């Protein structure tokens, strides 16, 4: 990709357009970090929103349906307790209530009705993420979905399916180098085809809580699939602040950032190394591989 300014693939300032307005104790609107508006080549829509109490109204996300696969994830804001969410939530899938209190991800196949989301308990701040796959247009996804239309009754399950098959409550740990310090080891895999056979996506994440060593520890590498690389801070009072300063080299071009960022990596574009220049607060690093469902398919079974 000669003469490409790879900065066009980095989003360091979110849009505020999705996820409703006027909801108390929740970022409202949510932070949009990937869309066709932000990166025209990326047919994905990614939002993040801090939850800082029981949302009001509760529920504020109602049963809805759309024509695209979606990954929904709720993660702990505490790097010392990454698996304990800090809340108890009920999420309806296909009319079946799914209760959880750990960092949890959901794969929602296109056409599956989902919602409402109901908070039962709140202990500490946590993050809600939605990643819609195959469409980067907010209105096409949610415009007629019914997401913001209150329903009189709770949904009823009508299919003979246990929708727990689309839920990941505990991660796999298969990536990382035990000799690297300052970050979660192993990283936490919260989406793969091994965990959910229908999900041809691979999502893994790690907390960075001090300057990693060695630095860099992620070298240049390349995949035969698209990827989103996400770095997110841990401070709900300053939600766009990363808490660090990082440089990621994309296509040979250094991209440096100190705020949250989402970087779209097109198929076949070399990326890395990643070098940390500061770590002021803990922050989360997430890699989302799109169109592959296993570690071996993404990295050939070898760490970059």
Residue ranges, per PLM feature:
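Extracellular structured ligand-interaction cores
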Residues: 68-72, 86-88, 126-128, 200, ...
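A short beta-strand-loop-beta hairpin characteristic of the jelly-roll/cupin
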Residues: 74-101, 139-142, 231-258, 298-299
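Double-stranded beta-helix
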Residues: 1-19, 117-174, 274-304
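A short glycine-rich, His/Asp/Glu-containing loop-to-beta-strand
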Residues: 26-70, 181-227
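Short intrinsically disordered coil segments
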Residues: 63-64, 88-90, 144-150, 220-221, ...
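Solvent-exposed interaction surfaces and binding hotspots enriched for charged
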Residues: 98-100, 170, 175-177, 193, ...
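Conserved metal-binding segment of the jelly-roll/cupin
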Residues: 93-120, 252-277
């Amino acid at each position: 990709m000669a003469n490409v300014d790879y900065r066009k693939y980095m989003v360091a300032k979110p849009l505020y357009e999705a996820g409703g307005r006027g909801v108390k104790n929740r970022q409202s609107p949510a932070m949009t970090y990937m869309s066709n508006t932000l990166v025209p080549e990326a047919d994905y829509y990614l939002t993040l929103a801090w939850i800082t109490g029981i949302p009001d109204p509760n529920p504020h996300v109602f049963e809805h349906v759309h024509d695209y696969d979606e990954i929904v994830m709720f993660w702990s804001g505490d790097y010392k307790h990454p698996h304990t969410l800090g809340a108890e939530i009920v999420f309806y899938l296909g009319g079946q209530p799914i209760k959880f209190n750990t960092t949890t991800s959901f794969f929602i196949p296109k056409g599956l009705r989902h919602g409402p989301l109901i908070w039962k308990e709140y202990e500490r701040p946590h993050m809600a993420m939605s990643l819609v796959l195959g469409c980067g247009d907010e209105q096409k996804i949610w415009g007629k979905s019914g997401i913001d239309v209150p329903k009189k009754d709770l949904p009823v399950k009508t299919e003979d399916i246990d929708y727990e098959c689309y839920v990941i409550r505990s991660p796999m740990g298969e990536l990382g180098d035990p000799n690297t310090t300052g970050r979660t080891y192993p990283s936490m895999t919260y989406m793969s085809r091994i965990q959910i056979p229908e999900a041809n996506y691979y999502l893994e994440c790690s907390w960075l809580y001090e300057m990693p060593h060695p630095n860099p520890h992620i070298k240049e590498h390349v995949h035969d699939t698209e990827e989103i690389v996400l770095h997110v801070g841990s401070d709900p009072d300053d939600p766009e602040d990363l808490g660090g300063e990082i440089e990621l080299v994309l296509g040979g071009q250094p991209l440096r950032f100190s705020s949250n960022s989402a970087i779209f990596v097109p198929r076949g574009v070399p990326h890395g190394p990643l070098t940390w220049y500061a770590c002021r607060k803990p922050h989360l690093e997430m890699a989302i591989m799109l169109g592959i469902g296993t570690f071996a398919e993404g990295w050939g079974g070898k760490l970059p």
